[in-house]
């Protein structure tokens, strides 16, 4: 390989490659292995810094105590790999694992669930291995994908799948606090629009959008609606503005949603920052 040998389609199933050194010290990128079969290969203590593997299989291979810093494992079967004490800093497994990609494109629901189950197991192993190395940013991404695979195995119209999707949408299974912030800002803005057209009460005066009013007057009222929406979302309730008519429904919904959204943000943020 170092002398330009063939690196495509190697059949190394069950091969004993203990301590193998494939570090490319003469180039900026690691060696490239394409469509290689390393099923149950023994790669204990191997030096694979920067290795690039595309396609093929590492299924049930033993990479215990190996060095996979900056390795690229794209579209590779990683099911059942032994990751004990494997160095995984900056490991790149692509946007999706091979089983994940195949499961999403599979039309047979039974076979798709098989792919998703294998993908879930692989993501779980990667998550545990990265946690063992203290790489919590990487483990956070893998736990999101693991739980996504678990959701995709559920019946399409089931309550549990819908609930799991909602949790993923709002906070990325506890790994994306910025999603909570964006949802909060979006809800505040949308509710302010409803208040703008449904009206508010201020000091005994009924305020509502009026087409005959000047642009400046309507713009000021829109800002007041935005202020009231923020106050309602955070459940401060100063009492200067009060909802009337349909605005009461939106205010009650916003206050209810805001109370647990703020609590959710605190939980997600603390979880993310204390790792």
Regions found by a protein language model. Give the residues of each.
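Outer-pore turret/helix-boundary of cation channels
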Residues: 186-225
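Short amphipathic alpha-helical coupling elements at transmembrane boundaries
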Residues: 141-144, 168, 251
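Extended, hydrophilic extramembrane loops/domains of integral membrane proteins
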Residues: 136-154
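Coil-to-alpha-helix initiation sites in intrinsically disordered, low-complexity, charged segments
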Residues: 96-98, 151-165, 217-224, 244
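Transmembrane alpha-helical segments and their cytosolic interface motifs
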Residues: 155-199
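Pore domain of cation channels
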Residues: 212-275
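Alpha-helical solenoid repeat scaffolds of the TPR/TPR-like class and their adjacent stem/linker regions
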Residues: 110, 122, 148-156
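Tandem repeat scaffolds
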Residues: 1-142
């Amino acid at each position: 390989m170092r002398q330009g040998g063939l690196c495509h389609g190697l059949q190394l199933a069950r091969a004993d490659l203990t301590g193998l050194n494939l570090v490319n010290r003469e180039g900026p990128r690691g060696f490239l292995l394409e469509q290689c079969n390393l099923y149950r290969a023994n790669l204990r203590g191997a030096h694979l810094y920067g290795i690039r593997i595309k396609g093929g299989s590492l299924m049930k291979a033993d990479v215990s105590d190996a060095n996979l810093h900056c390795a690229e494992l794209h579209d590779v079967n990683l099911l059942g790999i032994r990751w004990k004490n494997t160095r995984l800093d900056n490991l790149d497994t692509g946007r999706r694992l091979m089983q994940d990609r195949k499961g999403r494109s599979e039309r047979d629901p039974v076979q798709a669930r098989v792919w998703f189950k294998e993908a879930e197991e692989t993501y779980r192993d990667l998550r545990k291995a990265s946690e063992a190395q203290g790489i919590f940013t990487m483990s956070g991404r893998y736990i999101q994908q693991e739980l996504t695979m678990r959701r995709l195995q559920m019946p399409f119209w089931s309550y549990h799948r819908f609930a799991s999707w909602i949790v993923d949408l709002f906070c990325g299974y506890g790994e994306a606090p910025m999603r909570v912030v964006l949802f909060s800002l979006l809800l505040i803005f949308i509710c302010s629009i409803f208040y703008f057209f449904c009206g508010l009460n201020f000091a005994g005066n009924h305020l509502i959008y009026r087409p005959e009013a000047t642009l400046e007057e309507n713009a000021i009222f829109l800002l007041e609606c935005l202020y009231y929406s923020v106050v309602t979302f955070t459940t401060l309730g100063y009492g200067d503005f009060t909802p009337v008519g349909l605005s009461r429904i939106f205010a009650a919904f916003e206050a209810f949603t805001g109370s647990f959204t703020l609590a959710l943000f605190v939980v997600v943020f603390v979880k993310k920052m204390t790792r």
